[in-house]
Amino acid sequence: MITSLLAGMTILVIGDSHLATPGYLITTLHDELQKKGAVVYSYGACGMAAADWVKPTKMKSPPPCGTATRLNNSPIDVNPGPNTGTVPYGELVQRHTPNLVVFVMGDTMAAYKEPTLPRAWAWQQVTSLTKAVRVNPVKCAWVGPAWGTDGGMFAKNNKRVAEISELLSETVAPCTYINSLNLIKKSEIRAFDGQHYDAAGYKKWGQVISKALDSPEVAGKAKQR
């Protein structure tokens, strides 16, 4: 018998490259939410920042990493690009009428290759999307980035991860912030390229996100709407 607070809910998950490849969160998080009795619609797009989900935005990252969609029990539909892009948040809400929207975004706005975090730009990205949330009000949660490995092709570094996580925690309202850094230890997740994780890492991350969503603060409030 399913006793989860998420049971019977419709959940829309929107994210960056962590949701754009089979085996990543579009597999693990999606599966975990379904196990709890939710109907789940997941959308991922490589290299897209938050504001890119406010209006249709063409793919920025070169193939083979493009977009991916998973509509509840349907198989994952991967489009490697370049002729693909985002579906706006407002359109997705109208299409799926979710009880809860989950954003998984942070790495694309951390600008790891830049000498400093572009705080004003990142703030603008986030608030552009949260403004759209207020126009199409649905209870939402925002999942911040998890620890990575310093270096690699994306130049991810954990000092910057902590910086962008702090900025997100102060900026994502009305969404509830889920701080991945507090949910999973560095030793529990391994990034093979500095930013993206092996199968065990995505499984662990999907589990802790699902557990955080299955709480009175998130799922409970979503059901009250």
Residue ranges and their predicted role:
Residues 102-112, 129-162:
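Active-site segments of SGNH/GDSL-like serine hydrolases
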Residues 1-10:
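Hydrophobic alpha-helical targeting segments used for export or membrane insertion
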